[in-house]
Amino acid sequence: MADSPRSPGAERKLTLDPRVAERLQHLTLTATRAVEGFLAGRHKSPHRGVSVEFVERRGYVPGDDLRHLDWKAFARTDRLSIKRYEEETTLECTLVVDASASMGYPTDGRPTKYDHACQVAAALAHLVLAERDGAALALFDHQLDRVLPASTSPAHLLPLLQALVERAPGGTTDLNTVLGRLVERLPRPGIVVVISDLFGPVDTLASGLSRLGARTHDVVVLHVLHGDELRFPFDRLPRFEGMEEELRLLVDPRSLRPDYIAALEEWRSQVRRACTARGVDYHVVDTTAPLDVVLSAWLGARMARLARRG
Protein backbone atom coordinates (compact mmCIF):
# COMPACT_ATOMS: atom_id res chain seq x y z
CA MET A 1 0.00 0.00 0.00
CA ALA A 2 1.10 3.58 -0.55
CA ASP A 3 2.53 5.54 2.33
CA SER A 4 -0.11 7.41 4.29
CA PRO A 5 -0.03 11.21 4.29
CA ARG A 6 0.92 12.52 7.70
CA SER A 7 -0.43 15.52 9.50
CA PRO A 8 1.94 18.46 10.04
CA GLY A 9 4.30 17.76 12.91
CA ALA A 10 2.77 14.30 13.51
CA GLU A 11 2.75 15.04 17.24
CA ARG A 12 -1.01 15.53 17.48
CA LYS A 13 -2.36 13.50 20.40
CA LEU A 14 -5.77 11.88 20.64
CA THR A 15 -7.14 11.31 24.12
CA LEU A 16 -10.56 10.86 25.63
CA ASP A 17 -11.83 13.37 28.17
CA PRO A 18 -11.97 11.48 31.52
CA ARG A 19 -15.57 12.61 32.05
CA VAL A 20 -16.54 11.29 28.62
CA ALA A 21 -14.68 8.03 29.29
CA GLU A 22 -16.64 7.59 32.52
CA ARG A 23 -19.95 8.12 30.73
CA LEU A 24 -18.89 5.73 27.99
CA GLN A 25 -18.16 3.09 30.61
CA HIS A 26 -21.68 3.57 31.90
CA LEU A 27 -22.97 3.06 28.35
CA THR A 28 -21.10 -0.24 28.28
CA LEU A 29 -23.01 -1.49 31.31
CA THR A 30 -26.44 -0.35 30.14
CA ALA A 31 -26.11 -1.48 26.51
CA THR A 32 -24.57 -4.90 27.19
CA ARG A 33 -27.59 -7.12 26.47
CA ALA A 34 -29.26 -4.96 23.83
CA VAL A 35 -26.57 -4.27 21.23
CA GLU A 36 -26.05 -7.82 19.96
CA GLY A 37 -22.90 -8.23 21.93
CA PHE A 38 -21.30 -5.06 20.56
CA LEU A 39 -20.49 -3.96 24.08
CA ALA A 40 -21.23 -7.24 25.80
CA GLY A 41 -19.02 -9.76 27.47
CA ARG A 42 -21.42 -12.56 26.53
CA HIS A 43 -22.27 -13.02 22.87
CA LYS A 44 -24.56 -15.33 21.00
CA SER A 45 -23.64 -17.24 17.88
CA PRO A 46 -25.86 -19.09 15.41
CA HIS A 47 -23.40 -22.01 15.72
CA ARG A 48 -25.03 -24.51 18.06
CA GLY A 49 -23.00 -25.82 20.95
CA VAL A 50 -23.20 -27.27 24.44
CA SER A 51 -21.63 -24.39 26.36
CA VAL A 52 -23.39 -21.56 28.00
CA GLU A 53 -26.86 -20.30 27.44
CA PHE A 54 -30.12 -22.21 27.06
CA VAL A 55 -32.16 -20.79 24.19
CA GLU A 56 -35.14 -22.92 23.18
CA ARG A 57 -36.43 -26.42 22.50
CA ARG A 58 -37.20 -28.36 19.36
CA GLY A 59 -38.76 -31.74 18.73
CA TYR A 60 -36.59 -34.84 19.12
CA VAL A 61 -35.58 -36.68 15.95
CA PRO A 62 -33.80 -40.05 15.80
CA GLY A 63 -30.06 -39.58 16.06
CA ASP A 64 -30.18 -36.62 18.44
CA ASP A 65 -27.87 -36.76 21.46
CA LEU A 66 -30.02 -38.13 24.30
CA ARG A 67 -28.04 -36.08 26.81
CA HIS A 68 -29.86 -33.01 25.51
CA LEU A 69 -33.37 -34.37 26.07
CA ASP A 70 -35.52 -32.05 28.19
CA TRP A 71 -37.08 -34.52 30.63
CA LYS A 72 -39.00 -31.84 32.54
CA ALA A 73 -40.72 -30.75 29.35
CA PHE A 74 -41.45 -34.42 28.56
CA ALA A 75 -43.13 -34.83 31.95
CA ARG A 76 -45.38 -31.84 31.23
CA THR A 77 -46.19 -32.46 27.58
CA ASP A 78 -45.53 -36.18 27.00
CA ARG A 79 -43.40 -35.12 24.02
CA LEU A 80 -39.67 -35.58 23.59
CA SER A 81 -37.79 -32.36 22.91
CA ILE A 82 -34.18 -31.26 22.66
CA LYS A 83 -32.68 -28.25 24.40
CA ARG A 84 -30.95 -25.88 22.02
CA TYR A 85 -28.00 -23.78 23.02
CA GLU A 86 -25.98 -20.94 21.63
CA GLU A 87 -22.26 -20.56 22.00
CA GLU A 88 -20.53 -17.62 23.58
CA THR A 89 -18.07 -16.19 21.10
CA THR A 90 -15.57 -13.38 20.87
CA LEU A 91 -16.90 -10.57 18.75
CA GLU A 92 -14.76 -8.79 16.17
CA CYS A 93 -15.59 -5.16 15.46
CA THR A 94 -13.88 -3.51 12.48
CA LEU A 95 -13.83 0.29 12.52
CA VAL A 96 -13.64 1.60 8.95
CA VAL A 97 -12.64 5.28 9.00
CA ASP A 98 -12.82 7.63 6.01
CA ALA A 99 -9.58 9.62 5.63
CA SER A 100 -10.34 11.16 2.22
CA ALA A 101 -9.87 14.87 1.53
CA SER A 102 -13.48 15.86 2.23
CA MET A 103 -13.03 14.66 5.82
CA GLY A 104 -10.54 17.53 6.24
CA TYR A 105 -13.34 20.10 6.44
CA PRO A 106 -13.22 22.72 7.88
CA THR A 107 -9.83 24.11 6.94
CA ASP A 108 -9.93 27.17 9.22
CA GLY A 109 -8.39 25.55 12.30
CA ARG A 110 -11.59 24.19 13.82
CA PRO A 111 -11.74 20.43 14.47
CA THR A 112 -12.37 18.58 11.22
CA LYS A 113 -14.76 15.79 10.37
CA TYR A 114 -11.76 13.48 10.42
CA ASP A 115 -10.86 14.63 13.93
CA HIS A 116 -14.39 13.80 15.01
CA ALA A 117 -14.34 10.45 13.23
CA CYS A 118 -11.12 9.64 15.10
CA GLN A 119 -12.80 10.42 18.42
CA VAL A 120 -15.77 8.22 17.58
CA ALA A 121 -13.50 5.37 16.49
CA ALA A 122 -11.34 5.75 19.59
CA ALA A 123 -14.38 5.65 21.87
CA LEU A 124 -15.78 2.54 20.18
CA ALA A 125 -12.40 0.81 20.28
CA HIS A 126 -12.18 1.65 23.99
CA LEU A 127 -15.60 0.12 24.64
CA VAL A 128 -14.99 -3.00 22.53
CA LEU A 129 -11.61 -3.74 24.10
CA ALA A 130 -13.00 -3.10 27.58
CA GLU A 131 -15.36 -6.02 26.93
CA ARG A 132 -12.43 -8.22 25.82
CA ASP A 133 -13.71 -8.31 22.26
CA GLY A 134 -11.61 -7.82 19.15
CA ALA A 135 -11.14 -4.35 17.65
CA ALA A 136 -9.73 -3.83 14.16
CA LEU A 137 -9.13 -0.64 12.19
CA ALA A 138 -9.16 0.17 8.48
CA LEU A 139 -8.39 3.62 7.07
CA PHE A 140 -9.37 4.50 3.51
CA ASP A 141 -9.67 7.08 0.78
CA HIS A 142 -10.15 5.62 -2.72
CA GLN A 143 -8.51 2.43 -1.47
CA LEU A 144 -7.79 0.66 1.79
CA ASP A 145 -4.88 2.62 3.18
CA ARG A 146 -3.97 0.92 6.42
CA VAL A 147 -5.47 -2.11 8.13
CA LEU A 148 -4.76 -3.19 11.71
CA PRO A 149 -6.04 -6.75 12.36
CA ALA A 150 -8.33 -7.41 15.29
CA SER A 151 -6.94 -8.00 18.75
CA THR A 152 -8.61 -8.37 22.13
CA SER A 153 -5.63 -7.03 24.08
CA PRO A 154 -6.18 -3.70 25.89
CA ALA A 155 -2.69 -2.74 24.70
CA HIS A 156 -4.09 -2.79 21.14
CA LEU A 157 -5.78 0.56 21.79
CA LEU A 158 -2.50 2.49 21.54
CA PRO A 159 -1.55 1.39 17.99
CA LEU A 160 -5.14 2.02 16.90
CA LEU A 161 -4.98 5.59 18.18
CA GLN A 162 -1.54 6.08 16.69
CA ALA A 163 -2.75 4.94 13.27
CA LEU A 164 -5.61 7.42 13.47
CA VAL A 165 -3.54 10.44 14.46
CA GLU A 166 -0.73 9.71 12.03
CA ARG A 167 -3.08 9.95 9.06
CA ALA A 168 -4.03 13.27 7.48
CA PRO A 169 -7.10 13.52 5.24
CA GLY A 170 -6.32 13.30 1.53
CA GLY A 171 -7.41 11.67 -1.71
CA THR A 172 -10.75 10.88 -3.30
CA THR A 173 -13.32 8.30 -2.19
CA ASP A 174 -14.47 5.00 -3.72
CA LEU A 175 -16.67 3.19 -1.20
CA ASN A 176 -17.58 0.29 -3.47
CA THR A 177 -13.94 -0.61 -4.09
CA VAL A 178 -12.96 -0.04 -0.46
CA LEU A 179 -15.76 -2.15 1.04
CA GLY A 180 -15.19 -4.86 -1.56
CA ARG A 181 -11.52 -5.08 -0.62
CA LEU A 182 -12.46 -5.05 3.04
CA VAL A 183 -14.68 -8.11 2.57
CA GLU A 184 -11.64 -9.98 1.25
CA ARG A 185 -9.61 -9.03 4.33
CA LEU A 186 -12.11 -9.93 7.05
CA PRO A 187 -11.56 -13.52 8.28
CA ARG A 188 -15.09 -14.12 9.57
CA PRO A 189 -18.41 -12.31 10.03
CA GLY A 190 -18.51 -9.62 12.67
CA ILE A 191 -19.60 -6.03 13.16
CA VAL A 192 -18.34 -3.48 10.63
CA VAL A 193 -18.71 0.20 11.57
CA VAL A 194 -18.22 2.60 8.64
CA ILE A 195 -17.42 6.14 9.86
CA SER A 196 -17.56 8.49 6.88
CA ASP A 197 -19.14 11.59 5.36
CA LEU A 198 -20.21 9.29 2.49
CA PHE A 199 -19.39 11.87 -0.16
CA GLY A 200 -19.75 10.12 -3.48
CA PRO A 201 -22.46 8.44 -5.55
CA VAL A 202 -25.07 6.69 -3.41
CA ASP A 203 -25.06 3.69 -5.76
CA THR A 204 -21.38 2.99 -5.00
CA LEU A 205 -22.17 3.02 -1.28
CA ALA A 206 -25.13 0.70 -1.89
CA SER A 207 -22.98 -1.74 -3.88
CA GLY A 208 -20.32 -1.82 -1.17
CA LEU A 209 -22.88 -2.39 1.59
CA SER A 210 -24.43 -5.23 -0.40
CA ARG A 211 -21.04 -6.93 -0.64
CA LEU A 212 -20.59 -6.68 3.12
CA GLY A 213 -24.11 -7.91 3.82
CA ALA A 214 -23.62 -10.90 1.53
CA ARG A 215 -20.94 -12.09 3.95
CA THR A 216 -23.41 -11.81 6.86
CA HIS A 217 -21.57 -8.92 8.49
CA ASP A 218 -23.57 -6.75 10.87
CA VAL A 219 -22.98 -3.34 9.30
CA VAL A 220 -23.30 0.08 10.93
CA VAL A 221 -22.93 3.38 9.06
CA LEU A 222 -22.11 6.46 11.15
CA HIS A 223 -22.62 9.37 8.76
CA VAL A 224 -20.29 12.16 9.90
CA LEU A 225 -21.41 15.63 8.85
CA HIS A 226 -20.12 19.00 10.03
CA GLY A 227 -22.55 21.49 11.51
CA ASP A 228 -21.85 23.83 8.58
CA GLU A 229 -22.94 21.10 6.17
CA LEU A 230 -26.09 20.36 8.13
CA ARG A 231 -27.23 23.95 8.74
CA PHE A 232 -25.45 26.06 6.08
CA PRO A 233 -24.94 29.04 8.45
CA PHE A 234 -23.09 31.26 5.96
CA ASP A 235 -24.38 34.81 5.55
CA ARG A 236 -21.55 36.57 3.73
CA LEU A 237 -20.49 36.07 0.12
CA PRO A 238 -17.97 33.21 0.33
CA ARG A 239 -16.24 31.19 -2.34
CA PHE A 240 -17.16 27.53 -2.05
CA GLU A 241 -14.46 25.07 -3.11
CA GLY A 242 -14.72 21.33 -3.59
CA MET A 243 -12.60 19.23 -1.23
CA GLU A 244 -12.09 16.35 -3.66
CA GLU A 245 -12.84 18.02 -7.00
CA GLU A 246 -11.55 21.17 -8.72
CA LEU A 247 -14.78 23.09 -8.26
CA ARG A 248 -15.20 26.74 -7.23
CA LEU A 249 -18.47 28.58 -6.81
CA LEU A 250 -19.19 32.19 -5.84
CA VAL A 251 -22.82 32.59 -4.71
CA ASP A 252 -25.07 34.44 -2.29
CA PRO A 253 -25.48 31.90 0.56
CA ARG A 254 -28.79 33.38 1.74
CA SER A 255 -30.45 32.76 -1.61
CA LEU A 256 -28.80 29.34 -1.93
CA ARG A 257 -29.70 28.06 1.56
CA PRO A 258 -33.25 26.76 0.89
CA ASP A 259 -32.17 24.82 -2.20
CA TYR A 260 -29.07 23.53 -0.41
CA ILE A 261 -31.04 22.27 2.61
CA ALA A 262 -33.59 20.59 0.32
CA ALA A 263 -30.83 18.90 -1.70
CA LEU A 264 -29.06 17.81 1.50
CA GLU A 265 -32.22 16.22 2.89
CA GLU A 266 -32.91 14.41 -0.38
CA TRP A 267 -29.35 13.05 -0.45
CA ARG A 268 -29.55 11.94 3.18
CA SER A 269 -32.87 10.23 2.44
CA GLN A 270 -31.27 8.33 -0.43
CA VAL A 271 -28.38 7.26 1.80
CA ARG A 272 -30.78 6.20 4.56
CA ARG A 273 -32.88 4.17 2.13
CA ALA A 274 -29.78 2.47 0.72
CA CYS A 275 -28.78 1.45 4.24
CA THR A 276 -32.23 0.42 5.45
CA ALA A 277 -32.87 -1.72 2.36
CA ARG A 278 -29.75 -3.73 3.22
CA GLY A 279 -30.42 -4.09 6.94
CA VAL A 280 -27.70 -1.59 7.82
CA ASP A 281 -27.87 0.55 10.94
CA TYR A 282 -27.67 4.21 9.85
CA HIS A 283 -27.08 7.17 12.15
CA VAL A 284 -26.08 10.77 11.45
CA VAL A 285 -23.18 12.06 13.56
CA ASP A 286 -23.29 15.85 13.97
CA THR A 287 -19.76 17.04 14.76
CA THR A 288 -21.13 19.77 17.03
CA ALA A 289 -22.70 17.23 19.41
CA PRO A 290 -20.73 15.92 22.42
CA LEU A 291 -19.21 12.50 21.84
CA ASP A 292 -21.09 10.71 24.61
CA VAL A 293 -24.38 12.21 23.39
CA VAL A 294 -23.67 10.94 19.87
CA LEU A 295 -22.95 7.41 21.07
CA SER A 296 -25.88 7.40 23.48
CA ALA A 297 -28.28 8.44 20.71
CA TRP A 298 -26.96 5.82 18.32
CA LEU A 299 -26.91 2.99 20.87
CA GLY A 300 -30.39 3.91 22.05
CA ALA A 301 -31.71 3.76 18.49
CA ARG A 302 -29.90 0.47 17.91
CA MET A 303 -31.34 -1.06 21.08
CA ALA A 304 -34.84 -0.03 20.02
CA ARG A 305 -34.37 -1.57 16.58
CA LEU A 306 -33.07 -4.82 18.05
CA ALA A 307 -35.98 -4.94 20.49
CA ARG A 308 -38.46 -4.54 17.62
CA ARG A 309 -36.70 -7.29 15.71
CA GLY A 310 -37.11 -9.48 18.78
Name each region found by the language model.
Residues 285-310:
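C-terminal "exit" segments of structured domains
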Residues 209-213, 237, 299-301:
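Short, solvent-exposed amphipathic alpha-helical segments in soluble enzyme
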Residues 254-265, 269-281:
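C-terminal or mid-to-C-terminal helical accessory/interaction module adjacent to the motor/catalytic core
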Residues 233-259:
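Acidic, Ser/Thr-rich peripheral helices and adjacent loops at domain boundaries
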Residues 1-154, 191-196, 201-203, 207-211, ...:
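An amphipathic, basic-hydrophobic helix/alpha-beta surface used to engage anionic
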Residues 156-190, 202-204, 225-226, 230:
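Von Willebrand factor
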Residues 147-162, 300-301:
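Short, electropositive alpha-helical surface patch
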